[in-house]
């Protein structure tokens, strides 16, 4: 992996060069929350954010996504987007995108996702954890791939890791704003990462978790928290790896319809409903437990479906904590 340095005085020009790649989207503050939005100036960015409400998956899998329109006897695909830059993506969210890649880019690849993924230029950025983060315990606190370039803050600029062919091309075409990395830069980078590793307050005990879940299907803990859960589905909407959707046709006008796919949630009562009226998960208990098995049942090939970003904890209106639930399930078997 190649390392270069971006001095602080070149940061505004670096941003302008990114705008030449495509539309730039970055974290923007709204009161106490943050969102990825289109930005035209570095002054609009809040690079010291902890997490956005919606993860970057919304740029690849939209909440409401028009697939094609049907007009009389003709089917026309809805025009796709052009190239864009995701500026300031954290390591956990990059790991979330990598999980989506395994799903949507496996044969046969999803054409809508594939097109947007190819059009994306991802700029990662380092962060400091808060009380909700537990990505370190899942190994998603540091990304080695899945990005084009990654920024690590230094006292006098940024250490830039180059992670893709597109990243190499960008650095090569803009050599005038980059410099070589010094031993002092590498030392500062290492010191920051060591400090960051010690800052995590929450961790998930993943040892033998699949076996624990095998034995805990009837645990009373599921019922305890299912009664507290509102069933709103908020945790699935803000999750970087939840990808369930439904497809529906809507009439635009006479003889013209639009086929859409939109977010669905396993917390919705109709999610498990099939023809004949049977529902695979008819109760809130069934749906609550299912999400934990979906996120935490370790697959040797795919790994976990949770990246430890902390969104489900922070944005849960019932204040249910992901790690606490699993800890209680484990303790109930001892």
Curated annotation (Swiss-Prot):
Domain (4Fe-4S ferredoxin-type) ranges: 220-250, 294-328
Function according to Swiss-Prot or TrEMBL: Part of a bifunctional enzyme complex that functions as a hydrogen-evolving hydrogenase with sulfur-reducing activity. May play a role in hydrogen cycling during fermentative growth. Activity exhibited with NAD in addition to NADPH. The beta and gamma subunits form the sulfur-reducing component that catalyzes the cytoplasmic production of hydrogen sulfide in the presence of elemental sulfur.
Organism per entry: Pyrococcus furiosus (strain ATCC 43587 / DSM 3638 / JCM 8422 / Vc1)
Subunit-structure text: Dimer of heterotetramer of alpha, beta, gamma and delta subunits. The nickel-containing alpha and delta subunits constitute the hydrogenase activity. The beta and gamma subunits (flavin-containing dimer) constitute the sulfur reductase activity.
The name this protein goes by in its record: Sulfhydrogenase 2 subunit beta
Gene3D superfamilies linked: Alpha-helical ferredoxin (1.10.1060.10)
Coiled coil: none
UniProt-listed NCBIfam families: sulfhyd_ShyB (NF040829)
Chief localization: cytoplasm
Pfam families, per database record: Fer4_22
